[in-house]
């Protein structure tokens, strides 16, 4: 209801009864009541207007929020598209920063790898030179040792051949084959025809060396003693006197090889031990035991590094004598 409607006078009734008496106090009360009614209606109208304005304001605020949110989304999307474009072009700051860090790490790893390669190459070259020198030295040592061993073997074979020759000369008479005297009997008439003997002819006499070198040398010395001429007996010596006792045999030493060691004169000798080697002609040599075999030992002279082979039998018979000496 508008304010004009509130202020317009009410329509008069069609047929009104007789007017009552007029009193000024009643008129004032009537005006006061009308004023109260108008003020009440005005307050109601203001409240309705305020409610309507608040509703419109809420709708307007919601529209502004939606519009603002849409604007923020568009701005964010535009920023991401711009960053994507910069990334594809390679001009994005974050991309350049990370690429710079990766490039630095790459260069550092390449430098470390090159240093490691150089270090390993130098180490391999040093090892190669060292191994090459060791191989050359070992080759030269083996060559010298092989030469010495071959010379020693040839010398030993030469001595064996000389001993065989001497043995054949000493035992030549016993090797002569004497004809066997046979008697042929007359064949009886009923005896079968004799079948010729098809047995093989005996092989010519030959020496079978089934003895050790020490035993052979001992036998040779015995033969030499028997072969030497005997002195004639003195005519004044009575026949009943006992004969002069034979020369006492040579002194024998205890010598043997066990577990790669030489046991000689109540002492043990091993490989690489420094010794003195004395021969029967009073020659004293400074030597080192280079190896210990089954029946012999090899010694190396410290003066010229030549090697000699000494048999256990020679040590037992005293042909060579071994003495200890300090390694210095």
From Swiss-Prot:
Signal peptide: none
Annotated spans, Disordered: 1-69, 226-252
GO terms, molecular function: histone deacetylase binding; identical protein binding
Keyword Transcription regulation appears in the UniProt entry: yes
Entries under Pfam families matching the protein: Sds3
GO cellular component terms, A-Z: nucleus; Sin3-type complex
Span list, region Sin3 interaction domain (SID): 188-226
A single GO BP: negative regulation of cell migration
Compositional bias of kind Acidic residues: 23-37, 45-54
Main localization category: nucleus
Biased composition (Basic and acidic residues): 56-69
Sorted UniProt keywords: Acetylation, Apoptosis, Chromatin regulator, Coiled coil, Isopeptide bond, Nucleus, Phosphoprotein, Repressor, Transcription, Transcription regulation, Ubl conjugation
Family indicated by similarity: Belongs to the SDS3 family.
Protein name (Swiss-Prot/TrEMBL): Sin3 histone deacetylase corepressor complex component SDS3
Source species of the chain: Mus musculus (Mouse)
Lineage, top ranks: Eukaryota, Metazoa, Chordata, Craniata, Vertebrata
Gene: Suds3
């Amino acid at each position: 209801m508008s304010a004009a409607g509130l202020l317009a006078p009410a329509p008069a009734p069609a047929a009104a009864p007789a007017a009552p008496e007029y009193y000024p106090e009643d008129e004032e009360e009537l005006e006061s009541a009308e004023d109260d009614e108008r003020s009440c209606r005005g307050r109601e109208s203001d409240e309705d207007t305020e409610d309507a304005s608040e509703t419109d304001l809420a709708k307007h605020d919601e529209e502004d929020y939606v519009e603002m949110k849409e604007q923020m989304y568009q701005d964010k999307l535009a920023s991401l598209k711009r960053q994507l474009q910069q990334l594809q072009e390679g001009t994005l700051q974050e991309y350049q920063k990370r690429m710079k860090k990766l490039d630095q790490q790459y260069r550092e790893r390449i430098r470390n790898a090159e240093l490691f390669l150089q270090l390993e190459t130098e180490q391999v070259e040093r090892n190669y030179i060292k191994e090459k020198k060791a191989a050359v030295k070992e080759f030269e040592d083996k060559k010298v040792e092989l030469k010495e061993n071959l010379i020693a073997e040839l010398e030993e074979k030469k001595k064996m051949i000389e001993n065989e020759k001497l043995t054949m000369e000493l035992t030549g008479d016993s090797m002569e084959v004497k004809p066997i005297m046979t008697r042929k009997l007359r064949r009886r008439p009923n005896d079968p025809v004799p079948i010729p003997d098809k047995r093989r002819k005996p092989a010519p006499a030959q020496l079978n060396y089934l003895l050790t070198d020490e035993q052979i040398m001992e036998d040779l010395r015995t033969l030499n003693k028997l072969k030497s001429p005997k002195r004639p007996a003195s005519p004044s010596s009575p026949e009943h006197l006992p004969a002069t006792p034979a020369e006492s045999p040579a002194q024998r030493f205890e010598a043997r090889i066990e577990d790669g060691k030489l046991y000689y004169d109540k002492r043990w000798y091993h490989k690489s031990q420094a010794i003195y080697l004395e021969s029967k002609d009073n020659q004293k040599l400074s030597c080192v035991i280079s190896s210990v075999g089954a029946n012999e030992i090899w010694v190396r002279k410290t003066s010229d590094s030549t090697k000699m082979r000494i048999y256990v039998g020679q040590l037992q018979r005293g042909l060579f004598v071994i003495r200890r000496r300090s390694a210095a």
